[in-house]
C-alpha cells in the first residue's frame, strides 16, 4: 500500500510539473501575441510592404495576385487607414500575414 501511495505521489508531482510547463508556455505565447499587436497603422503598412519585399514580390505581381491596383497598394503601404479594410485584409492574407491570432 505504501508503494502505491508513493507512486501516486510521484505521478501527482509529475502532473504538477507538466501543468507548470503548460502555464509557462501559454504565458510566453500570450506575451508574443501582445508584442505583435498593431498600435500604429502607418507602421503596419510599412510592415506589410517590408514583408512583400522580403518575399521578393513586385507591386505588379501583387496587383495580379490580389486584383488591387498599384496605386491602392502604394496608399495601403503608406497609410492603411486610407484603404478599405477588406483590401487590407486581402493583401495581408496574400502576403501570409494574419490579422487575427485567435
From Swiss-Prot:
Q: Which UniProt keywords apply?
A: DNA-binding, Transcription, Transcription regulation
Residue ranges the UniProt entry marks as DNA-binding: 59-78
Q: Which GO terms describe its molecular function?
A: DNA binding
- Sorted alphabetically, which Gene3D superfamilies does this protein's record hold? lambda repressor-like DNA-binding domains
Provenance organism: Haemophilus influenzae (strain ATCC 51907 / DSM 11121 / KW20 / Rd)
Which residues belong to any copy of the HTH cro/C1-type domain?
48-102
Signal peptide coordinates: none
InterPro entries noted in UniProt: Cro/C1-type_HTH, Lambda_DNA-bd_dom_sf
Name of the protein this chain belongs to: Uncharacterized HTH-type transcriptional regulator HI_0666.1
PROSITE patterns in alphabetical order: HTH_CROC1
Pfam families this protein is in? Answer: HTH_3 (PF01381)
Amino acid at each position: 500500500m505504501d508503494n502505491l501511495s508513493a507512486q501516486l505521489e510521484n505521478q501527482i508531482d509529475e502532473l504538477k510539473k507538466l501543468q507548470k510547463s503548460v502555464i509557462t508556455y501559454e504565458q510566453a505565447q500570450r506575451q508574443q501575441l501582445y508584442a505583435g499587436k498593431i498600435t500604429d497603422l502607418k507602421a503596419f503598412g510599412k510592415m506589410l510592404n517590408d514583408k512583400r519585399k522580403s518575399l521578393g514580390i513586385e507591386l505588379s505581381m501583387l496587383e495580379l495576385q490580389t486584383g488591387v491596383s498599384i496605386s491602392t497598394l502604394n496608399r495601403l503601404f503608406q497609410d492603411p487607414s486610407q484603404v478599405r479594410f477588406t483590401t487590407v485584409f486581402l493583401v495581408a492574407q496574400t502576403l501570409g500575414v494574419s490579422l487575427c491570432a485567435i
